[in-house]
C-alpha cells in the first residue's frame, strides 16, 4: 500500500531508502527489500527505515536524543502510535485501520440512518469538511446519493453532528490505544512526553479538533504540523543526507540474497 512504499531515492541506480511499518515480520521486511532491490531501477542497495522514526525526523525532532517522544501517525490504512528515544522505538502499536475506515463508517451510518447510499468520494468529502474529534460543530453539507427505497438520486443535507456520530467509535478506539501506550511508557520518558506534548501526523490528523480530543483524554498538549501527510518523506530525505542519522536505516541484503 502507499503508506508502505514511501521512499526517498539518493541517486538512480544507487541506493533506495524505504519507510516500513514497525509491526511487520522479518519475512515481510525481506519482501519489501526484494521488491525494490529487484525492481527496474536495480539499486546497489535498499535501506529500510521504521516509519515512526521517519515521521519524527520529518517533524523536526532529533530522535537520537535520550528524551522520550510520542508520535501518532494517522495514515490511510493504518494508525501507528509510537514512543521513540535514543534513535529507536521503545513502544509501538500498529492499528490495522486508518482514515479510510472513517470513510467506510460514514457510508454505513448514512445508509443506516437515512436510507441513503453515498460513494467513497462523498464520504471522504464529508470527513474532510465536517469531520471532528469533538461534538457540537454546526456546519452542514449537501450531498447527492441514491435513495435505498426508490433507487433514485436524491439530495440531502448532512450535519457535522451526523459525521461525528459516524466516526465516534473509531476515534474512541484510537484514544484507547494512545492511553494504553502511555500507561506502558517508562516514567522517565512519560515525563518528557508530558513536557513536549504528543505529536500527530499523517493525513488523518487533519480532522478538526482531533488535537483537542487527544488532549482531553490524556491531559497532555498535542502538536500538529503543516502537510502532515508528507512528514515521512521529509524525514527520509533528512535521514538520507544527514550523517547523524546514519545508524537508523538498516539493510537486509546479506540476509536476503543467496
Could you tell me what each predicted segment is?
Residues 3-74, 84-198, 205-233, 237-258:
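Nucleotide/phosphate-binding catalytic cleft detector across ATP-hydrolyzing
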Residues 76-78:
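Short acidic, Gly/Ser-rich segments with clustered Asp/Glu that frequently serve as metal-coordination loops
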Residues 80-82:
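A structural feature that tracks compact, well-ordered secondary-structure segments
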Amino acid at each position: 500500500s502507499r503508506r508502505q512504499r514511501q521512499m526517498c531515492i539518493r541517486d538512480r541506480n544507487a541506493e533506495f531508502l524505504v519507510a516500513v511499518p514497525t509491526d511487520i515480520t522479518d519475512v515481510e521486511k525481506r519482501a519489501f527489500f526484494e521488491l525494490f532491490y529487484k525492481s527496474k531501477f536495480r539499486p546497489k542497495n535498499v535501506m529500510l527505515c521504521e516509519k515512526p522514526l521517519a515521521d519524527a525526523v520529518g517533524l523536526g525532532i532529533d530522535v537520537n536524543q535520550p528524551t522520550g517522544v510520542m508520535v501518532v501517525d494517522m495514515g490511510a490504512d493504518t494508525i501507528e502510535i509510537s514512543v521513540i528515544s535514543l534513535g529507536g522505538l521503545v513502544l509501538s502499536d500498529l492499528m490495522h485501520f486508518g482514515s479510510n475506515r472513517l470513510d467506510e463508517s460514514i457510508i454505513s451510518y448514512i445508509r443506516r440512518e437515512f436510507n441513503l447510499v453515498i460513494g467513497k468520494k462523498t464520504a471522504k468529502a464529508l470527513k474532510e469538511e465536517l469531520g471532528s474529534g469533538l461534538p457540537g460543530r454546526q456546519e452542514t453539507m449537501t450531498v447527492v446519493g441514491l435513495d435505498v427505497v426508490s433507487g433514485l438520486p436524491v439530495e440531502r443535507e448532512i450535519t457535522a453532528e451526523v459525521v461525528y456520530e459516524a466516526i465516534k467509535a473509531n476515534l474512541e478506539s484510537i484514544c484507547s490505544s494512545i492511553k494504553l501506550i502511555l500507561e506502558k511508557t517508562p516514567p522517565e520518558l512519560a515525563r518528557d512526553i508530558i513536557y513536549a506534548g504528543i505529536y500527530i501526523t499523517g493525513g488523518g490528523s487533519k480532522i478538526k479538533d482531533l488535537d483537542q480530543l487527544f488532549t482531553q483524554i490524556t491531559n497532555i498538549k498535542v502538536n500538529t504540523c503543516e502537510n502532515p501527510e508528507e512528514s515521512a518523506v521529509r524525514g527520509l530525505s533528512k535521514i538520507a543526507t544527514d550523517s547523524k542519522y546514519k545508524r537508523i536505516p538498516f539493510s537486509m541484503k546479506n540476509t536476503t540474497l543467496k
